[in-house]
Swiss-Prot record:
GO molecular function annotation: haptoglobin binding; heme binding; iron ion binding; organic acid binding; oxygen binding; oxygen carrier activity; peroxidase activity
GO biological process: hydrogen peroxide catabolic process
Residues annotated to bind heme b: 88
Protein's name in the database: Hemoglobin subunit alpha-A
Lineage: Eukaryota, Metazoa, Chordata, Craniata, Vertebrata
Amino acid sequence: MVLSAADKGNVKTVFGKIGGHAEEYGAETLQRMFQTFPQTKTYFPHFDLQPGSAQIKAHGKKVAAALVEAANHIDDIAGALSKLSDLHAQKLRVDPVNFKFLGHCFLVVLAIHHPSLLTPEVHASMDKFLCAVATVLTAKYR
């Protein structure tokens, strides 16, 4: 999916606004995904999946860092997330649909915390961006 200049601007604006909350939102996104799509828990059998657990927060921080990295390198998401793509495809073997679930949950978290920011145009841009991230993360599954 090709991101237009307007899409790229919208994505950068969103990440600029969420700034210091990215880690918090990453953990909240994971927690929401585990609750809404319980099958995703199978990849975390060693985690304490209770809300607010240190493991959820730590992994949420990694999720947030990857999304920020992708946003910071929006013209080369594949390059920015290449190692992460390798990890998920070759070692972790995460079901590709989980990346779509994660993107959906991230949009919900954004909508909860920043309802006025998520206009229809920004929502569409973020959805395209998150789909692009999911596509990159699943590209090496073939």
